Amino acid sequence: MAQKRLLILGSVAVFALSACSSAAATPVATQAPVATQAPVATQAPVATQAALPYISIVSKGFQHQFWQAVKKGAVDEGTKEGATVNFIGPNTEQDVQPQLDMLSTELAKKPAALCFAALDSKAAGPTLQKFADAKIPVIAFDSGVDSTIPLTTVATDNIAAAALAADKMGEKLGGKGKVGVIIHDQTSRTGIDRAKGFVDEMTKKYPNIKIVGPQYGGGDLAKSADIAKAMLAANKDINGFFGGNEGSIGGVLNAVTELHLDQTKLTIIGYDSGQKQIDAINSGLELGAVQQNPIGIGAKCVVEAMLAIKGQTTFDKVVDTGFLWADKTTINNADVQAVLYK
């Protein structure tokens, strides 16, 4: 009897398990949406983004609006070329060590390429060597470096551009007078070349024009204004000023305005644009300024970087991005308007 009861209980248990299994199997169809959790299709854009080459761009900083224009050119070209562009720079153009630290930080990210505008043409050499050792192509832009590591340098011919400024000054002064020269620095390639281009041209072609300077204001408005005021105090007969970048010439304009000088007795020539210079040219306070192509510089450095990433090994030593002269008669011309920034 006991055996019969056990047999019956066992049969009931088997039946119950079978029933449970059947009941559990029923909702399987309702779990079909789980299959939609497979992330293959939705993750496709992530894979595309990960495949984009990462280009590090270390600029000279954001002290002047010039660099915002360069950044725009670089970022827009990066989008066009299918690259991720990280455009950075120190707070001022005197921050050499912070810029070197930024280089080291970008090196650790293992970028596909580096674009670099040096604040000090010599100081970056050891760090750039590390990029070369890691087989990361380097493109110099705006300010070159004293090194063979960069595959090319994308820049204005600053010697020729500053010589043009000297010619405009010499012609306006009738070949005689005294001109104060204020440059942003004597360590970057742009500072060195602009000072050389202006002074050499003036000395060669206009020997009766005396040069006061160059003196260096770090591209800072206040410092450059103080230098201009000191030059004027020590040289009552100064009748011209050349400022080698946006901040340098901006300081000159501030000094002349603050001292309430007779603007008709001064010829002021600058470099680059920005709203202050545009207004000064339109008002007649400033004769004119040499215009670089900042958007073109930014775009072209990304173009060259992408060529290197794709395996190109032969490059022109310099990619000349050109320059224009802007004065009251030409500032509204289409070609000049295309390179102005505010």
Residue ranges of predicted features:
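A residue-level marker of the well-folded mature domains of exported/periplasmic proteins
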Residues: 6, 21-342
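Hydrophobic helical h-region of N-terminal Sec-dependent signal peptides
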Residues: 11-13
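Bacterial N-terminal signal peptides that target proteins for export
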Residues: 1-9
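C-terminal motif of bacterial Sec signal peptides marking the signal peptidase cleavage site
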Residues: 16-19
